[in-house]
Amino acid sequence: MTLILGIDPGSRITGFGVVQQTPRGCVYVASGCIRTGAGELAERLQIVYRGVREVIQTYGPVTMGIEKVFMAKNADSALKLGQARGAAIVAGAEEGMEIAEYTATQVKQAVVGTGAANKEQVQMMVMHMLKLTSKPQIDASDALAIAICHAHTRSSLLPHGLGAARSRGGRLRL
């Protein structure tokens, strides 16, 4: 049974979700948000890095799924998002984690069944799949969805003898 970390990166709020992959599906372990406040970008990135590292050290996941950068409303937002992703990826890499990237469409498809799902639909399916009794924060819900997507990807690869998710194209090899 594998512990999986999902990360929904952001320069102000980074969501995290930890699930345990079992033969019967995913089981909820933990979720939350790393809030950086309104400081300088370098300080906020350091908070993201330290927060992700703390989650990894607290729960001990061995693999991480993280959302890919999408084209934001403006280029500056996309750059900041990419930098927050980088901080989270470095935290995982330093802990020796296997890291995989997923587009928002891939995550929605894996959790809801359609890549056009909205955030509320994703949140409701995450609650249903993990048997949660209350709504997680939206960023934490997105991170749990990423973890579930990563679990589905891993389980679809393992029966074919391909090993871990890093064997597929588009994965980070660190």
Curated annotation (Swiss-Prot):
GO molecular function: crossover junction DNA endonuclease activity; DNA binding; magnesium ion binding
Sequence positions that bind Mg(2+) 2: E67
Localization of this protein: Cytoplasm
Keywords: Cytoplasm, DNA damage, DNA recombination, DNA repair, DNA-binding, Endonuclease, Hydrolase, Magnesium, Metal-binding, Nuclease
Alphabetized PROSITE patterns for the sequence: RUVC
Catalytic activity: Endonucleolytic cleavage at a junction such as a reciprocal single-stranded crossover between two homologous DNA duplexes (Holliday junction)
Enzyme Commission code: 3.1.21.10
InterPro entries, alphabetized: RNaseH-like_sf (IPR012337), RNaseH_sf (IPR036397), X-over_junc_endoDNase_Mg_BS (IPR020563), X-over_junc_endoDNase_RuvC (IPR002176)
Active site: D8, E67, D139
GO biological-process terms attached to the record: DNA recombination; DNA repair
Cofactor binding mode and count: Binds 2 Mg(2+) ion per subunit.
Catalytic class of the enzyme: hydrolase
Pfam family of the protein (one): RuvC
TM region(s), chain numbering: none
GO cellular component annotations of the record: cytoplasm; Holliday junction resolvase complex
Function: The RuvA-RuvB-RuvC complex processes Holliday junction (HJ) DNA during genetic recombination and DNA repair. Endonuclease that resolves HJ intermediates. Cleaves cruciform DNA by making single-stranded nicks across the HJ at symmetrical positions within the homologous arms, yielding a 5'-phosphate and a 3'-hydroxyl group; requires a central core of homology in the junction. The consensus cleavage sequence is 5'-(A/T)TT(C/G)-3'. Cleavage occurs on the 3'-side of the TT dinucleotide at the point of strand exchange.
Record family assignment: Belongs to the RuvC family.
Subunit record text: Homodimer which binds Holliday junction (HJ) DNA. The HJ becomes 2-fold symmetrical on binding to RuvC with unstacked arms; it has a different conformation from HJ DNA in complex with RuvA. In the full resolvosome a probable DNA-RuvA(4)-RuvB(12)-RuvC(2) complex forms which resolves the HJ.
Listed name of the protein: Crossover junction endodeoxyribonuclease RuvC
Annotated organism of origin: Pseudomonas fluorescens (strain SBW25)
Gene assigned in the entry: ruvC
